[in-house]
């Protein structure tokens, strides 16, 4: 009895896919180069990928520089988080197709660990911290707590007075403490080469200065001169302005020729309504 055996042939591949390849050479090349290939050498990572579209096939080569950087433990743990969406199959770290690195933004802390506020002084370029109590800003010229010595509006006046005092001391040193023919000490103001002066004659003009606060932002020097000129002769008007924006800070100093005029200006203009604000006029504090 004869026995016949039938062998089952393997199924034919999809003809549509074969016709799309075009040739067996391209099919072999596609199997060989299919998917991305990565190679790392001397800290340089090269990723080669083949992209096909209607216009043809393109070979994309991306080069990365591998840098080993030590980071804190929380940062390293965040990089291991599971990705989602279109990036769920990507490896750890940023991917060029979905992530790009923007410019670095530095964080500036305005308080230290003790909770004290830190201020940055642009003119001196030093950083200091304030304490929780007491006044921080202080001027060594006019003794005011509103500004620093470097930005004092009366610094030139005080410097001139200091130069005059230094010249008078040098002159007194040359003349000597005694008068010829006498063994007694004579005060500098009682000597023959200098006229006798009183304390009122050497009174500084800053004592004739009043401080004006709660000023409107659009108020200028001419408007203040016109307002305070109704009381007396105004020698100087200084409006404090911000050094970065050049906008008024809301206060000014007005210097009169006589102290009585300053007192009259305080009595008349304290509480005066200018635009939509009420002015506060007071003596400049000298301590």
UniProtKB/Swiss-Prot annotation:
Segments forming domain RRM: 208-286
CDD domains found in the cross-reference section: eIF3G, RRM_eIF3G_like
Protein biosynthesis is among the record's keywords: yes
Organism field: Brugia malayi
Known function: RNA-binding component of the eukaryotic translation initiation factor 3 (eIF-3) complex, which is involved in protein synthesis of a specialized repertoire of mRNAs and, together with other initiation factors, stimulates binding of mRNA and methionyl-tRNAi to the 40S ribosome. The eIF-3 complex specifically targets and initiates translation of a subset of mRNAs involved in cell proliferation. This subunit can bind 18S rRNA.
Origin organism lineage: Eukaryota, Metazoa, Ecdysozoa, Nematoda, Chromadorea
Annotated region (Disordered), positions in chain: 163-207
SUPFAM superfamilies in UniProt: RNA-binding domain, RBD
Protein localization: Cytoplasm
Entry's family note: Belongs to the eIF-3 subunit G family.
GO biological-process terms attached to the record: formation of cytoplasmic translation initiation complex
Assembly mode: Component of the eukaryotic translation initiation factor 3 (eIF-3) complex.
Protein name as it appears in the record: Eukaryotic translation initiation factor 3 subunit G
């Amino acid at each position: 009895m004869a026995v016949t055996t039938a062998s089952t042939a393997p199924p034919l591949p999809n003809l549509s896919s074969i016709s799309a390849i075009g040739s067996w050479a391209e099919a072999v090349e596609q199997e060989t180069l299919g998917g991305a290939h990565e190679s790392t050498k001397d800290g340089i990572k090269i990723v080669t990928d083949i992209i096909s579209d209607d216009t043809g096939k393109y070979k994309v080569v991306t080069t990365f520089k591998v840098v080993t950087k030590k980071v804190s433990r929380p940062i390293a743990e965040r990089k291991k988080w599971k990705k989602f969406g279109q990036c769920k199959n990507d490896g750890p770290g940023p991917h060029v197709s979905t992530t790009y690195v923007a410019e670095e933004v530095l964080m500036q802390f305005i308080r230290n660990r003790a909770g004290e506020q830190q201020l940055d002084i642009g003119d001196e370029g030093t950083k200091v911290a304030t304490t929780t109590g007491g006044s921080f800003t202080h001027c060594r010229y006019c003794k005011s707590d509103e500004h620093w010595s470097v930005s004092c509006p009366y610094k030139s006046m005080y410097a001139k007075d200091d130069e005059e005092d230094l010249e008078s001391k040098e002159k007194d040193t040359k003349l000597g403490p005694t008068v010829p023919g006498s063994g007694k000490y004579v005060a500098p103001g009682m000597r023959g080469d200098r006229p006798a002066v009183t304390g009122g004659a050497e009174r500084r003009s800053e004592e004739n200065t009043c401080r004006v606060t709660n000023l409107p932002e659009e108020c200028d020097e001419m408007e203040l001169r016109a307002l305070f000129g109704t009381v007396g002769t105004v020698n100087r008007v200084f409006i404090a302005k911000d050094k970065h924006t050049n906008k008024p800070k809301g206060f000014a100093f007005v210097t009169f020729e006589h102290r009585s005029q300053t007192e009259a200006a305080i009595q008349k203009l304290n509480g005066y309504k200018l635009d939509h604000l009420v002015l506060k006029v007071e003596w400049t504090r000298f301590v």
